[in-house]
Structure formats: C-alpha cells, structure tokens
Design a protein with these regions (language model features):
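Copper-binding active sites and cupredoxin-like electron-transfer domains
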Residues: 1-173
C-alpha cells in the first residue's frame, strides 16, 4: 500500500514515494508548504474501496506562528462503510462494491467507529470554554452538513484552508 497526503504538493501526494511492498518498510519526509487541515488516504487501486475500508485520516499543518490558544481541541473525521454483512454483524465485513456504487452505506461513522462520539465517549466542554474542532470527511461518497445543535460556529475555515466565514450555523464537509 501507499498513501496520498493531500498536504503534499506533487503527483499523487507522495503516493509513489510511500509505496511499500509486503514485508518491507518505507520512510519519506516532506516540507508542508500550506497550512490547513488535509485528508490522507490509501492511494493503491482500487482507491475508493480502500477508503471505504477506513484507510484514511486527517493531517493538520499548523501555520508557522501556530494557532491561537483554546481550552479544548477535537478531531472528527466522517466516513462511510459498505458491507456485505448484515447491519451490526460482528467481525470482519467484506466490502460491497454494488452498495458503494449506489452510495448506500451500511454505516456512516465518525472517527472510524459507530458510536465513537456518543455516551461516555462524547466530546465534553464547559460553558465559556473555547473549543476548536478539526472536521474532515474521508468519504468515499457522502458529504455532511455539519452543525452543532444549540450553537453557532464563531469561525469556519472553509474546506480547511485560510478563508474564514464567521457566525456559521452549518458547514458542508
């Protein structure tokens, strides 16, 4: 496998440099030129299937001067899974290409797992605390109209870049 780091400029986002054969290891480095929040994912064909199996994540490139201090930070990454098993079936689930092509996921998850941000695992903050959310979407198919019930985002960095929208109720991720 290999990875496509959307924070890396150049062909394949580092895919050629990160290709690693079974039983081997690979290292590479890069200079991040642009601050922002970026997706990375497996770049080995079929890419969509590997993404749909959870081979993605977020990489944050902070500006040289750093980010303003906040009380809490959270990372949230959405993904969708398409399985041949029945909903809730335990164990390894085989990928269902037909469901993926129809964009009919069995699971839409945050941080790779059903219920990862609910109950005892929910994000907890106190009134008056400043919070920074890093929100991404690994896909491979669905988007999210992301919002927090009962609040408005002071600042939204559109698509993880440097354009800032203020006082946002819902943002597309």
């Amino acid at each position: 496998h290999n990875i496509d780091l959307h924070a890396v400029s150049g062909q394949g986002g580092g895919a050629a440099a990160t290709f690693t054969a079974p039983g081997h290891e690979t290292q590479f480095s890069f200079t991040a030129l642009n601050a922002g929040l970026y997706i990375y994912h497996c770049a080995t064909a079929p890419v969509g299937m590997h993404i749909a199996n959870g081979m993605y994540g977020l990489i944050l490139v902070e500006p040289k001067e750093g980010l303003p201090k906040v009380d809490k930070e959270f990372y949230v990454c959405q993904g969708d899974f398409y399985t041949k098993g029945t909903y809730g079936e335990a164990g390894l689930q085989q990928f269902d290409m037909d469901k993926a092509l129809k964009e009919q996921p069995d699971y839409v998850v945050f941080n790779g797992k059903v219920g990862s941000l609910t109950g005892d695992k929910s994000m907890k903050v106190k009134v008056g605390e400043t919070v920074r959310l890093f929100v991404g979407n690994g896909g491979p198919n669905l988007v999210s109209s992301f919002h927090v019930i009962g609040d408005i985002f002071d600042n939204v960095y559109v698509e993880g870049g440097s354009l800032v929208n203020h006082n946002v109720q819902t943002t597309l991720v």
